[in-house]
């Protein structure tokens, strides 16, 4: 998989915020069926267990974040969810405070200077994503699904890749098929194809395989940026 060139392949810097997004008209019909009910039961059960088990780890890294850089330990950021509905994703802060003051909304890159040393470790091991178990319990997110993007980036990518909004037909996930097979350093077009493949073939068994793959990544540190 090739690395995303922010300034060439995907120009997303300094995208101006707006309220009327064209991608909202390009999503299509939501995914329906009994498999979604099973998926939600699985998500809530595993999400509850994950919340309890990950709490000590989250608290330890929250303290480390506070001790090693200025700013809050956690942050909320608006993301686009099911059928274009916005929600706030919760993460451990892995970047320096006000990191996007100059760059605007851009994808993080490999060796991104905005990422703190402890943040780099958290991204490699996905520890920064652990607070999102709360998003799963609330129903904003699933354990497995297309990773949610920010509204301005979703709009920009949708203008370049017409199938990108179709990723919004299902609840977004903490981890996904694109992350397992391409890591974070893939283009939006590649990510779009992998995510839409997942939507077409998703099942609880598929989700279990993706979760196992994610655990392997956590222990190897592969695929992070």
Where are these regions (language model features)?
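A short, structured surface patch at a secondary-structure boundary
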Residues: 108-171, 210-218
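Glycine-rich flexible loop motifs, especially short His-Gly-Gly/GGXG/HXGH segments used as catalytic or interaction
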Residues: 5-48, 76-77, 183-204
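C-terminal terminal-structure detector
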Residues: 29-30, 166-225
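A membrane-cytosol interface segment of integral membrane proteins
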Residues: 1-5, 144
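Short, glycine-rich, amphipathic interfacial segments at transmembrane boundaries or analogous
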Residues: 6-15, 75-114, 175-193
């Amino acid at each position: 998989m090739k690395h995303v060139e922010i300034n060439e392949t995907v120009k997303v810097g300094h995208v101006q915020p707006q309220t009327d997004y064209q991608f909202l008209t390009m999503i299509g019909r939501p995914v329906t069926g009994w498999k979604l009910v099973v998926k939600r039961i699985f998500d809530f059960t595993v999400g509850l267990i994950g919340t309890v088990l990950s709490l000590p780890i989250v608290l330890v890294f929250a303290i480390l974040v506070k001790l090693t850089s200025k700013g809050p330990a956690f942050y909320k950021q608006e993301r686009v969810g099911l059928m274009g509905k916005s929600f706030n994703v919760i993460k451990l802060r892995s970047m320096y405070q006000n990191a996007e003051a100059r760059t605007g909304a851009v994808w993080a890159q490999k060796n991104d200077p905005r990422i703190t040393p402890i943040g780099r470790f958290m991204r490699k091991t996905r520890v920064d994503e652990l607070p999102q178990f709360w998003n799963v319990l609330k129903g904003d997110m699933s354990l497995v699904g297309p990773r949610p993007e920010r509204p301005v980036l979703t709009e920009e990518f949708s203008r370049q890749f017409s199938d990108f909004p179709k990723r919004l037909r299902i609840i977004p996930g903490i981890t996904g098929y694109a992350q397992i097979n391409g890591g974070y350093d893939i283009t939006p077009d590649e990510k779009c194809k992998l995510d839409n493949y997942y939507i077409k073939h998703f099942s609880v068994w598929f989700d279990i395989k993706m979760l196992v793959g994610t655990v392997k990544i956590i222990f190897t540190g592969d695929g992070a940026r």
